[in-house]
């Protein structure tokens, strides 16, 4: 059992007999009374997102999960295919199970497949990934004076803000937790 005040984005819990991934968790305190933990939970099987408010101090069950190293192979329709590196078994995950991780997946990339009772329910990405810029505005001399950045589209369709010196074709590092530019690859 885990206290709801310790819930963090990305954790898996069992609530109402179903497995949920925590999308958001924030603490709210009201005057004298005890606090409230507001969460946004995504049902792993159905993809349904619900908001649940827990009184602080309440406990929930953390889902028992196992992780296996896998390689992302390809996408076919709305399914993503992975091969485990230990026994070379292939698994397909739906777009709902993958979620926003689809914007960081590049063929042959290594990820951790998340299993619950022998069934894959999601993936864990590395902290940073290298992606290629496919579309951005050209930079001009003196652009760096104003600071900030310019919009760019990456090979996976992810749209982020990059510094002015980044050009089309550049490989950059992106933080998978925040979706922000980290540096050149």
Swiss-Prot record:
The keyword Lipid biosynthesis does not apply. Signal peptide: none annotated. It is found in: Cytoplasm. GO terms for biological process: peptide biosynthetic process. One of its GO terms (molecular function) is translation elongation factor activity. GO terms for cellular component: cytoplasm. Keywords: Cytoplasm, Elongation factor, Protein biosynthesis. The keyword Cytoplasm applies. InterPro entries: Elong-fact-P_C, NA-bd_OB-fold, Rib_uL2_dom2, Transl_elong_fac_P/YeiP, Transl_elong_KOW-like, Transl_elong_P/YeiP_cen, Transl_elong_P/YeiP_CS, Transl_elongation_fac_P. It comes from the Bacteria. Pfam families: EFP, EFP_N, Elong-fact-P_C. Pathway: Protein biosynthesis; polypeptide chain elongation. Belongs to the elongation factor P family. Involved in peptide bond synthesis. Stimulates efficient translation and peptide-bond synthesis on native or reconstituted 70S ribosomes in vitro. Probably functions indirectly by altering the affinity of the ribosome for aminoacyl-tRNA, thus increasing their reactivity as acceptors for peptidyl transferase. This is Elongation factor P. It comes from Thermotoga maritima (strain ATCC 43589 / DSM 3109 / JCM 10099 / NBRC 100826 / MSB8). The gene is efp.
């Amino acid at each position: 059992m885990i206290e709801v005040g310790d819930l963090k984005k990305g954790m898996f819990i069992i609530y109402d007999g179903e497995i949920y991934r925590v999308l958001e968790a924030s603490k709210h305190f009201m005057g004298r009374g005890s606090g409230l933990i507001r969460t946004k939970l995504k049902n792993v099987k159905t993809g349904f997102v619900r908001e649940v408010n827990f009184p602080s101090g309440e406990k929930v069950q953390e889902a028992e999960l196992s992780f296996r190293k896998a390689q992302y192979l390809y996408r076919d329709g709305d399914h993503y295919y992975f091969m485990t590196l230990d026994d070379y078994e292939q698994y397909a995950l739906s777009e709902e199970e993958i979620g926003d991780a689809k914007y960081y997946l590049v063929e042959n990339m290594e990820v951790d497949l998340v299993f619950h009772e022998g069934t894959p329910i999601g993936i864990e990405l590395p902290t940073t990934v290298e992606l290629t810029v496919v579309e951005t505005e050209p930079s001009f001399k003196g652009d760096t004076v104003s600071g900030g950045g310019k919009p760019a589209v990456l090979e996976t369709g992810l749209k982020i803000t990059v510094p002015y010196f980044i050009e089309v074709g550049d490989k950059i590092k992106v933080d998978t937790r925040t979706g922000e530019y980290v540096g050149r690859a």
